[in-house]
Amino acid sequence: MNAWEVNFDGLVGLTHHYAGLSFGNEASTRHCFQVSNPRLAAKQGLLKMKTLADAGFPQAVIPPHERPFIPVLRQLGFSGSDEQVLEKVARQAPHWLSSASSASPMWVANAATIAPSADTLDGKVHLTVANLNNKFHRSLEAPVTESLLKAIFNDEEKFSVHSALPQVALLGDEGAANHNRLGGHYGEPGIQLFVYGREEGNDTRPSRYPARQTREASEAVARLNQVNPQQVIFAQQNPDVIDQGVFHNDVIAVSNRQVLFCHQQAFARQSQLLANLRSRVNGFMAIEVPAAQVSVSDAVSTYLFNSQLLSRDDGSMMLVLPQECREHAGVWRYLNELLAADNPISSLKVFDLRESMANGGGPACLRLRVVLTEEERRAVNPAVMMNDTLFNALNDWVDRYYRDRLTAADLADPQLLREGREALDTLTQLLDLGSVYPFQREGGGNG
């Protein structure tokens, strides 16, 4: 059956700031306490969405979360009115305010893991929300992510949205950022490659930085998503590259159809994994980047592999990259050699995503890939699909509500909280989502 990959991109939130919350993510740590520009960040993301939509790649949007997230601050013992909660936490424990204000939901590659209907036992599209257990600020996301996905994929005959796994380290799950799908045409059954960093009882694990994904979680997600067991491979990421800042697999590998584009050192027992894929995926092609040409360190600093590999109608592929790749002489030289070589990648598209990149999120972090048949695509909430009208409406919305300068100290401003809630109330109406945010359900909004 014919199917297409639709990229659902996360819209950057109003509290986008640099706080170094993500140990193991070197860009996040390096840019801690810099001044951010939320308006520019949102516009950089919107421009990527619109440019790809105009080039013929189906594109949709997932909205940001409510931030600062007052309910979690109350859970941590700060009481009073919302304004009093902000004032108290800013004075007594500002690090909690930063965590509760993180715009990290914009990286929707971590929102969920997807199984297309061609791969599932019941013929539905399955989406399992990620618990993001390893980082406090990200562990807050799952409930609202679930509400958003249910409002977007709201036809229960075609879509099953599953709640996140229990919030324990043993079941740490980081979503699609540790998941690849390989195969022929999108509508044909594919092989799902689940990538984990550690498993119980196995001493092969990183020592410097945390392995956020467990094998136990990957196995549970495959079960929840009802993936045909014949179509699943579990593979361990190389712990050495996790210790060099590769905190998700999408920082060291990206797949599309029959192609796996990855670093030579991406996986533990890599030659064995590639042989397995070669035997199970027709026409499988591994494009392994040698360490001698691009080091792991350069891959992390440029986000070469946190790229999008997109298929054109003629079977050729386009690699969507952050500007940092073009600015690195060695990486750009490699990419031009790649274009000249015998492989499906025939063009490069570069975007300026500096605001997101400074927090450790490139093009692939910002998108959730969902393979849909024509019938399934028609069942998606149409208001989230990117087109001229939505692009203009969202740009105007960003201009109206977003600040162009934000520091950690600004997070305590009650006006920022009010601006954010008003903005999200307007956005839920624009995207026809209903009341998906806690503040709306408590009567604070009219969505």
From Swiss-Prot:
NCBIfam families: arg_catab_astB (TIGR03241), PRK13281.1 (NF009789)
GO BP annotations, alphabetical order: arginine catabolic process to glutamate; arginine catabolic process to succinate
Role summary: Catalyzes the hydrolysis of N(2)-succinylarginine into N(2)-succinylornithine, ammonia and CO(2).
SUPFAM superfamilies on file: Pentein
Catalytic residues identified in the record: 174, 248, 365 (nucleophile)
Molecular function GO labels: N-succinylarginine dihydrolase activity
Matching Gene3D superfamilies: Succinylarginine dihydrolase (3.75.10.20)
Positions with a binding annotation for substrate: 19-28, 110, 137-138, 212, 250, 359
Gene: astB
Substrates-to-products reaction catalysed: N(2)-succinyl-L-arginine + 2 H2O + 2 H(+) = N(2)-succinyl-L-ornithine + 2 NH4(+) + CO2
Pathway this chain belongs to: Amino-acid degradation; L-arginine degradation via AST pathway; L-glutamate and succinate from L-arginine: step 2/5
Pfam family, one: AstB
Protein name (Swiss-Prot/TrEMBL): N-succinylarginine dihydrolase
Keyword annotations from UniProtKB, A to Z: Arginine metabolism, Hydrolase
E.C. no: 3.5.3.23
Enzyme's top EC category: hydrolase
Oligomeric and partner information: Homodimer.
Similarity comment: family membership: Belongs to the succinylarginine dihydrolase family.
